[in-house]
């Protein structure tokens, strides 16, 4: 579990999107969730995974069993057949944090939650999502955001991580670490 307080335009969201795709690609039965504060950002993060698949060499390219505006279901060439003779599948699902119920009822094994400090219903959405995420080995949660004042769930989780009061590893990436 990681919580990242970041500056803009450092490639952190791109890295996280790539990591989530990598975990989904190599983890049978992975259920990945990507959620951002607005639909344009959510779509951009989701399209990064589409571009990764599109640009993969055919030797490594996963089979897309379903692909639409909100979900990609893949079978990776790395997946081995299970006891029933079937190859497992993994999914990558897109949400936007526009409703207090966004993501509720899902059971992700991997979650990339972006710009949480700007979510309108941050407390309710995170409560619903966190109920469905197991503590089992292999699960992964990445919370990342630029700052938005000393308020809200992202701030509370960030302070808790700094104080060692929750399971998140705090990662601070200020603007001055990137030369422009």
PLM feature segments, named:
Residues 1-180:
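Phosphate/NTP-binding elements of NTP-utilizing enzymes
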């Amino acid at each position: 579990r990681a919580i990242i307080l970041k500056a803009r335009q450092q490639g952190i969201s791109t890295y996280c999107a790539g990591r989530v795709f990598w975990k989904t690609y190599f983890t049978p039965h992975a259920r990945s969730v990507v959620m951002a504060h607005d639909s344009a950002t959510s779509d951009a993060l989701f399209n990064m995974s589409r571009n990764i698949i599109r640009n993969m060499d055919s030797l490594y390219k996963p089979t897309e069993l379903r692909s639409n505006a909100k979900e990609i279901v893949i079978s990776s060439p790395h997946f081995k057949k299970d006891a029933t003779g079937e190859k497992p599948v993994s999914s990558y699902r897109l949400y936007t944090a526009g409703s207090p119920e966004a993501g509720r009822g899902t059971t992700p094994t991997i979650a990339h939650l972006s710009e949480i400090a700007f979510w309108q219903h941050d407390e309710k959405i995170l409560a619903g999502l966190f109920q469905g995420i197991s503590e089992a080995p292999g699960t992964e949660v990445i919370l990342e955001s630029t700052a938005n004042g000393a308020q809200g769930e992202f701030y509370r989780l960030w302070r808790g991580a700094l104080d060692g009061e929750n399971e998140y590893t705090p990662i601070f990436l200020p603007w001055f670490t990137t030369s422009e």
